[in-house]
Amino acid sequence: TIPFLARVTTQTTQSVGLQVGRLSAISTVGSVIGTLLISYLLIPLAPNTYTMIMVVALEIVLVAVYFLIFEKGFKQTPGVLPGILAGMVICGIAGRVEAVKSPSIGKELFRKNSNFGLMQVVDSPSGNVRYYLNDYLTQNIFDPKEDKSLTVFTYMLRGLTHAYHPSPEKVLCIGLGVGIVPMQLAKEGSTIDVVEINPGVVEIGEKFFGLDKSTFNLHLEDGRYFLNASKEEYDVVILDAFLGDSSPSHLMSRECFESMSQRMENDAVLVINAFGHFSEGEDFFMASLDKTLRAVFKSVHIHDGTRGNVFFVASKKEGLEPHRSMDMSEVHPKLIPFVETAWKNTIDANPESGIILTDNYNPVEYYDSKIREEIRLNFALNMRGK
């Protein structure tokens, strides 16, 4: 861009260096201003699609300005003007389509952009099902009439906590979700610390999912930072940081699990909500997560929900076994068969597959890309009612 602008704006060869320097300075200042605008204005206040449409429209305007100023109009290139007009019309149509677009599964109650994606809350036409979406991908499902979750992982995280620890007095939840799990544990007498990186989900939880943040201690920061800074010790650590189609890889490394281990009592347990498969050729993430946990903890159990949702339980204690069976009395009736399957279906990962994940080498996003695409596709098809 700079060489082209230098050629257009330079009148004599003596001023080439000065003009290039000016253009470079302007470009640098523009990059800084653009980054600040995107980070602090466009991302929080405008959907990503609107931002893309505005950028395209601005580029079309710049083309028009160039021809008006430097080419003295469109007489020499008559085909440019229709192209500019067509581009502006397309931008207008795209903006209109985005404005009226809504999920096909029901009524949109809430829409807001955040630094971590577009957040939406959608009710089904009957009003019996409420969805929390991030970038159009389902993050949680709720029955507002029964005041119960409609996701298996909600019941499994709570159930595994009680099954593997006899009396969880202090619990750390890395990932708030919409607040269902921490609130349940708090009502049962546990002291709860919650670490959540996205403040936007707190607003959603309070408005649409009955979240009462006074029942736990909320820390709005990255989970890894909290682990390194905290001096507290916990009976249970729940890692539920799944977002979109995957979990943050920096929370799935050996170094991160070592930080968690330092925050855990000797008989404490770590409960993880993850997604993946165990079939040959598709088990890199699950096998690697198992190996990485075993590099830090003495006991690891895997509960496979058979539909991609997998739960890991790890402890510094040797010979970890459940103290009791899961209580199904609080599970939504529609989910009891699925929760029972996830509880009873304990499996072992293939020891020949996967690697120990570290901060220095964590290629999960590459090797697990096919699974993540599948998860994203299934979420998208569900949102379209297929």
What are these regions (language model features)?
Residues 1-11:
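Intracellular juxtamembrane helix-capping segments at the cytosolic ends
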Residues 11-15, 69-78:
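Membrane-interface helix-boundary motifs at transmembrane edges
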Residues 13-24:
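Loop-to-transmembrane helix entry/capping segments in MFS-fold secondary transporters
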Residues 23-31:
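Structural signature of transmembrane alpha-helices in multi-pass secondary transporters
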Residues 31-39:
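Glycine/proline-centered helix-kink
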Residues 52-67, 78-88:
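Symmetry-related core transmembrane helices of the 12-TM Major Facilitator Superfamily/SLC fold
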Residues 74-163, 299-386:
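Soluble small-group transferase modules, centered on the S-adenosyl donor enzyme superfamily
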Residues 152-275, 279-289, 296:
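The AdoMet/dcAdoMet-binding core of the Class I SAM-like
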